[in-house]
UniProtKB/Swiss-Prot annotation:
This is Large ribosomal subunit protein bL21. Keywords: Ribonucleoprotein, Ribosomal protein, RNA-binding, rRNA-binding. GO terms for molecular function: rRNA binding; structural constituent of ribosome. Part of the 50S ribosomal subunit. Contacts protein L20. One of its GO terms (biological process) is translation. Belongs to the bacterial ribosomal protein bL21 family. SUPFAM superfamilies: L21p-like. The keyword Heme does not apply. It holds the Pfam family Ribosomal_L21p.
């Protein structure tokens, strides 16, 4: 089975017993969460979401992605500014699908 779910502002194609990386979610490691914004489940398509369809996931870990380095340079002023950013994420494991 597979499904397309919305988590945050992004859509993810998920399969059972698969891990996905999503934007950071509130919750502790090992906590079970339900994603109820299901756009598609196998061959069923929602308008826009499927009613009574959920994807049950378990939080595996929280972390930070690799650092992105940015440089702001103004040539005439001899100015150089360096920035860095690490995006937080949550790793989810898909346990099962609930539907009617």
């Amino acid at each position: 089975m597979h499904a397309i779910v919305v988590c945050g502002a992004k859509q993810y194609l998920v399969h059972e017993n698969e891990s996905i990386f999503v934007e950071k979610l509130a919750g502790k490691v090992g906590q079970e969460i339900q994603l109820d914004k299901v756009l598609m489940l196998d061959e069923k398509i929602g308008k826009p979401y499927l009613e009574k369809a959920k994807v049950v996931c378990v939080i595996e870990k929280h972390g930070l992605k690799s650092k992105i380095k940015l440089i702001k340079h103004i040539s005439q002023k001899h100015h150089l500014k360096r920035y860095g950013h690490r995006q937080p994420y949550t790793k989810l494991k898909v346990v099962r699908f609930i539907h009617d």
